[in-house]
């Protein structure tokens, strides 16, 4: 599905931008702890953006389960990386409670991709 390729490309593009912003714009402004949080958000956004691109490439040849995998990964980026970006910038710790929701969405998305592979790929 072309949409997942676009969403994946946007996620990876934004992770390059947020990574550069963290390295140059936030240097010296955040503690080491919160810089680490920022970097984790950047890395997970990149990994799952690449996953979305892969899902976009293969989604036309498999089932609707692959589309579910794509949406779950995308929502995972929003919840996981989004909450970590906001946490790093605001240091409002309660936002860290949202992060595991994103992690669960990532796991569910990868699991859905595994299931669709077993189900529809010979």
Curated annotation (Swiss-Prot):
It comes from the Bacteria. GO terms for cellular component: plasma membrane. The keyword DNA-binding does not apply. Belongs to the UPF0382 family. It is found in: Cell membrane. The keyword Coiled coil does not apply. It is a multi-pass membrane protein. This is UPF0382 membrane protein SH2409. The chain crosses the membrane at residues 3-23, 46-66, 69-89, 98-118. It holds the Pfam family DUF423. Keywords: Cell membrane, Membrane, Transmembrane, Transmembrane helix. InterPro entries: DUF423.
């Amino acid at each position: 599905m072309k949409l997942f390729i676009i969403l994946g490309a946007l996620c990876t593009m934004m992770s390059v931008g947020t990574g550069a912003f963290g390295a140059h714009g936030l240097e010296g402004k955040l503690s080491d702890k919160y810089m680490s949080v920022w970097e984790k958000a950047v890395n997970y956004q990149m990994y799952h953006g690449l996953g979305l691109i892969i899902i976009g490439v293969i989604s036309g040849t498999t089932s609707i389960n692959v589309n579910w995998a794509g949406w779950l990964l995308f929502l995972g980026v929003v919840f996981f990386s989004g909450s970590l970006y906001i946490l790093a910038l605001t240091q409002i710790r309660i936002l860290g409670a949202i992060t595991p929701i994103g992690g669960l969405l990532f796991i569910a998305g990868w699991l859905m991709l595994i299931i669709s592979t077993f189900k529809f790929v010979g």
